[in-house]
Amino acid sequence: MIDDDGYRPNVGIVICNRQGQVLWARRYGQNSWQFPQGGINAGETAEQAMYRELFEEVGLGRKDVKILASTRNWLRYKLPKRLVRWDTKPVCIGQKQRWFLLQLQCSEAEINMQRSNTPEFDGWRWVSYWYPVRQVVSFKRDVYRRVMKEFSSVVMSLQESVAQGGRSAPGYRRKRG
């Protein structure tokens, strides 16, 4: 499904833990890392697509996460010309994305990148909140910067809650200092 401007509707997913770290996933068979993302199918809402992609790419369901925020607007990036498939119609020149910030509610042991017959990722790790902005492929950096800026106040308040002795998510134990 490509819109009239040549952009494919898509969802992006930022999963954070109680410490404010985010899940950073390695693309299958590559040394390329990114947040989970995927297309919105015809007749599907952005939220429905997010839950489908969450299960397909990360192996988590609704009960495993809590939606903390979503972007107010669509965010767009253009594909580099070398990645555009000019021989397909309609031509997709990029993606327009709605992003969701999720908090992990289950044990990280539940994360399973191999639930799909065609896995998108073959590994993951927790990274500091701003790390992805500097590390993602260059044509996605502006969108990542905008997403992380929009979600930052939510994640920072989460970190403050933990620092002040807030309850940890199920499956997590606070480290004692």
UniProtKB/Swiss-Prot annotation:
Similarity field: Belongs to the Nudix hydrolase family. RppH subfamily.
Cofactor(s) this protein requires: a divalent metal cation
Pfam families associated with the record: NUDIX
GO molecular function per UniProt: metal ion binding; mRNA 5'-diphosphatase activity
One biological process term in Gene Ontology: mRNA catabolic process
Disulphide-bonded residues: none
Root EC class: hydrolase
Motif (Nudix box): 38-59
Listed name of the protein: RNA pyrophosphohydrolase
Function: Accelerates the degradation of transcripts by removing pyrophosphate from the 5'-end of triphosphorylated RNA, leading to a more labile monophosphorylated state that can stimulate subsequent ribonuclease cleavage.
EC assignment: 3.6.1.-
Record-annotated Nudix hydrolase domain positions: 6-149
Keyword terms: Hydrolase, Metal-binding
Gene Ontology CC annotations of this record: cytoplasm
